[in-house]
């Protein structure tokens, strides 16, 4: 086993085809987004962490989202082959895709993805992997930062997979120009 935490962050370049990225973004014009909130397991409440700077998100269905969702299986398979851990071969599934929208001055506070609130209904489990996808790169700012200070270089169509636990804190810096679109799903 490799002891370097960075080893378990896998970037799959151009995993999402440009045409699909463009189609998803175009179709998002018709979708209502809501202010993103984190679930606080101590207070059992949802709350923002960045006040007026909090990004917006949606689980809404848009044309192309199902195609992308089905292809995530292959990305997860690639990741499991990459980390090559014979004792970690099974997973039950992954959540429906959540789409994040960052307009100017919006960000996501530092956090880890050990999320339990997404498994309150039909799905049962604990997230083991986070899958992030980047639908565009024609904006300024909005850098994904891991471990407080490590900027992840990502481009349109890239997919990033990493463990969903306290060892992988991450945030998104404020967007300074344009609109940043990304997707997220959690493997359980």
Where are these regions (language model features)?
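Fe(II)/2-oxoglutarate oxygenase catalytic core
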Residues: 1-159, 167-188
């Amino acid at each position: 086993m490799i002891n370097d935490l960075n080893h378990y962050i896998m970037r799959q370049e151009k995993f999402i085809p440009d045409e699909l990225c463009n189609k998803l973004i175009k179709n998002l014009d018709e979708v209502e987004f809501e202010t993103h909130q984190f679930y606080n397991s101590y207070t059992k409440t949802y709350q923002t962490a960045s006040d007026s700077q909090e990004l917006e998100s949606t689980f809404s269905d848009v044309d192309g989202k199902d195609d992308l969702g089905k292809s995530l299986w292959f990305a997860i398979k690639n990741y499991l082959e990459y980390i090559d851990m014979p004792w970690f071969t099974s997973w039950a599934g992954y959540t429906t895709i959540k789409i994040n929208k960052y307009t100017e001055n919006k960000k996501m506070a530092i956090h880890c993805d050990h999320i339990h609130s997404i498994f309150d209904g039909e799905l049962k489990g604990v997230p083991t992997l986070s899958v992030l996808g980047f639908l565009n790169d024609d904006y300024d700012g909005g850098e994904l930062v891991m471990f407080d200070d490590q900027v992840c270089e990502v481009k349109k169509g890239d997919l990033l997979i990493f463990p969903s636990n306290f060892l992988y804190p991450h945030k998104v810096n404020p967007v300074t120009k344009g609109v940043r679109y990304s997707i997220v799903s959690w493997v359980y």
